[in-house]
C-alpha cells in the first residue's frame, strides 16, 4: 500500500504534482521492510545540507571521456569553466536541473563541476529530518528524469571507475540540531564526536 507523505509541484506538467510515498503493509499502518523512511527519527529542528556528487554517463563511460583511455588528468575540472573542462551538454543540464528543483519547491542551494571529468555536484538544504531526506530524493529523481531527453544516464555509485586514480562520488551531509546552534560548546561537540567514533568503521 502506498502512503503519500510529501507533494511537490511537477515543473514538467501544468497543474501536475509529484507525490512522495512510503510503502506500507496491507494493513496500511505497518511499514514495509523496505520502507527506510519510516525508520527516520523526525526532528523538525534538525537542519541538513546535502552535497550530492554524481557522474553523467553516456555510451557506458563518463561524459567527456574518449572511447579508449582517459581524458587529461584531474585538476582543472573542479569548479571548471571553459570548453576543454566542461564544454559539453553538462552545464546546460545542471542549470536546467536547478530551475526544475526550484520550481518544485526544493531548496536547491548550488551546483559545481567536480574533480573528475563528467562529474558534478548539487546541494540541497532542508529543515526537518524527513523533509530534508524527501527533498534530496526528489532532486535525484528530477535529475534522472531530466537527462532522459539528453540520452544521458546518472551514475551515483561511489567508485564507478573502480580502482583508478579517478575521483569517486559521495554525498557529504552537513547537519545541526537546535542545541548545537543555540548552545553548542567545545565539551558538547567533543562528546558528540566521541559517540560518532564508536561506529566510525561501520559508517565507512
Regions found by a protein language model. Give the residues of each.
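Glycine-rich, acidic/polar active-site loops that bind/position phosphate-bearing ligands
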Residues: 1-204
